[in-house]
Amino acid sequence: MTQTNLMTAPSLQPGQLIARGVTRQLAALGFASVEELVPTRGLRVDVMALGPKGEIWIVECKSSRADFMSDSKWDGYLEWADRFFWAVDADFDIDLLPEDTGLFVGDSYGAELLRMGPEKRLAAARRKKMTHLFATHAARRLHLLRDPHAIPQWG
């Protein structure tokens, strides 16, 4: 039997490093978070966070101007969360980002919430769907962590 060293992480891309810092800050704010969640066909959010009062936040991590400019789907995420945020590093020109969205600035070790995203509460049915999706996504990630050789038959 071989044992996987959970402390050794694979090489992370710049956006994933920002996501790591953001998830640390979200945890400090009392949120649980998952990365790369698909709320609906054609969309994949970088970070979804579930707050202590059931609030749902989506955070999109951008590592460069080119990364931001190539993202034409971000406004499609707004209908899947109570609040929407960008997360960028300290060198990113934040003037490029829409002012009516939230903002984290960080790195792989942490992040700071600079601007709270405006709240648009989800309808009860959408909230139930997203909470279930969050729980399922988290459980499957945990399953694969414990059994990385499993070939899941999840649809």
Where are these regions (language model features)?
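N-terminal short leaders/motifs
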Residues: M1-M7, G54-K62
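Active-site beta-strand-loop-beta-strand hairpin of nuclease catalytic cores
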Residues: R41, V45-I58
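Short, flexible loop segments at the rims of nucleotide/cofactor-binding pockets, characterized by
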Residues: E36-V38, E60-D67
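Short secondary-structure boundary/capping elements
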Residues: P14, P39-G42, M69
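Non-catalytic C-terminal interaction segments of nucleic acid-processing enzymes
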Residues: T2-S11, Q16-E35, L96-G155
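Catalytic cores of nucleic-acid endonucleases
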Residues: R20, S63-D107
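Short, solvent-exposed loop/turn elements at beta->coil junctions and helix N-caps
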Residues: E35-P39, D91-F92
